[in-house]
A protein has these predicted regions:
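Glycine-rich phosphate/adenosyl-contacting loop at the front of the ribokinase-like
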Residues: 1-62, 67-73, 77-78, 252-253
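Conserved phosphate-binding/catalytic region of the ribokinase-like
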Residues: 2-6, 169-170, 199-313
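A glycine-rich helix N-cap at a beta->alpha junction
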Residues: 75-90
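Short gly/ser/thr-rich secondary-structure transition/capping motifs
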Residues: 80, 116-121, 161-168
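Conserved phosphate-binding/catalytic loop of the ribokinase/pfkB sugar-kinase fold
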Residues: 88, 98-140
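A short, aliphatic-rich alpha-helical micro-motif
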Residues: 127-131, 176-177, 219
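Conserved beta-alpha-beta core of the PfkB/ribokinase-like small-molecule kinase fold
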Residues: 135-211, 232-234
Length: 313
């Protein structure tokens, strides 16, 4: 990976998160313990995490022409990300609202806004950066067209791709067949089971995932499929049938927002830098766990030093 960057098909949202004792019932208003407003988005989070792991990062992040777009430039500067990632379009900048309860569980709503204006043409304009990258990552806060275009460019050039299909929607065949690494959580795995005509009940258990869902997905293009299971850890299945289970790490969780983004970016970057799959999974699980120990996401995403310290490396 020396001299090569991670290319992130990003998303940018102004993220508002509130800490509550419990989730409100329909029609109920609750007092929040804290409210945080910060730059966020799955794509931005993954880019920040990759940078904190020491990777050079390039990519695309779309913002609108409203006041919220002003959050983006200082966020990139603070994270050590290049301003060339920004694409300015007409319309509203993406926004998101998240609630975190006393146990650290979350629920999130996203208005993608300008992120959906990111296009295949934007991707084609960055083709050299994509074909020369060490890894290209995508997520579903943007549309299908830029992901399909970027992944096709990457795979033709022999560059691995990583897809985290969240917020979940059906994965187009053209995207899935160009995906090297597919990372899903338990909710997304259930939805994929239904889409593939499998019985979703119990499909997220390690044994059934490895025996049923993962092989069905691997037949369609990916070389590695990973199921994240929150505090329970993760399970990875390779195209040659290798199954690796990674236990979760016990931490004092205060806010699980961003943990999946930390996991995905860490797994991809560590694999791209030549680490073994077991080591990359372990580092990814640690990154996700450490992210949950602080409120918010931007400052909670851990450094490589913190990950290696917890891993004893």
């Amino acid at each position: 990976m020396a001299g090569k960057a991670v290319f992130v098909l990003g998303s940018f949202v102004v993220a508002c998160s509130a800490k509550v004792a419990r989730f409100p019932r329909p029609g109920e208003s609750l007092a929040a313990e804290t409210v945080t407003i910060e730059p966020g988005g799955k794509g931005l989070n993954q880019a920040i995490m990759a940078r904190r792991l020491g990777a050079e990062v390039q990519g695309l992040l779309a913002v609108g022409d409203d006041l919220a777009a002003a959050f983006a430039p200082p966020a990139l500067e603070r994270a050590g990300l290049p301003p060339s990632m920004l694409v300015r379009v007409a319309g509203s900048t993406g926004s998101g609202i998240g609630l975190t309860d006393a146990s650290g569980e979350t629920c999130v709503a996203i208005a993608s806004g300008a992120n959906l204006a990111l296009s295949a043409e934007h991707v084609r304009q960055r083709a050299p950066a994509i074909t020369e990258a060490a890894l290209v990552t995508g997520q579903f806060e943007i549309g299908n067209a830029p992901i399909e275009a970027a992944f096709a460019l990457a795979r033709r050039a022999g560059v691995p791709t990583l897809l985290n299909p969240s917020p979940f929607r059906e994965i187009p065949d053209a995207v899935l067949k160009q995906t090297s690494i597919l990372i899903v959580n338990e909710t997304e795995a259930r939805s994929l089971s239904i889409a593939l005509g499998l019985q979703p009940g119990g499909m997220t258990g390690p044994q059934r995932f490895a025996a049923k869902l993962a092989p069905a997905l691997l037949e369609q293009g990916p070389e590695l499929v990973v199921l994240t299971r929150g505090a329970a850890g993760a399970i990875a299945v390779t195209a040659d049938g290798q199954v690796i289970t990674q236990k979760g790490f016990a931490v004092e969780t205060v806010d699980s927002l961003g943990a999946g983004d930390a996991f995905a970016a860490t797994l991809g970057v560590r694999l791209a830098t030549g680490h073994s799959l077991p080591q990359a999974l372990r580092n990814a699980a640690i990154a996700g766990a450490l992210t949950t120990t602080r409120n918010g996401v931007f400052d909670a995403l851990p450094t490589l030093a913190a990950i290696e310290a917890m891993a004893g490396e």
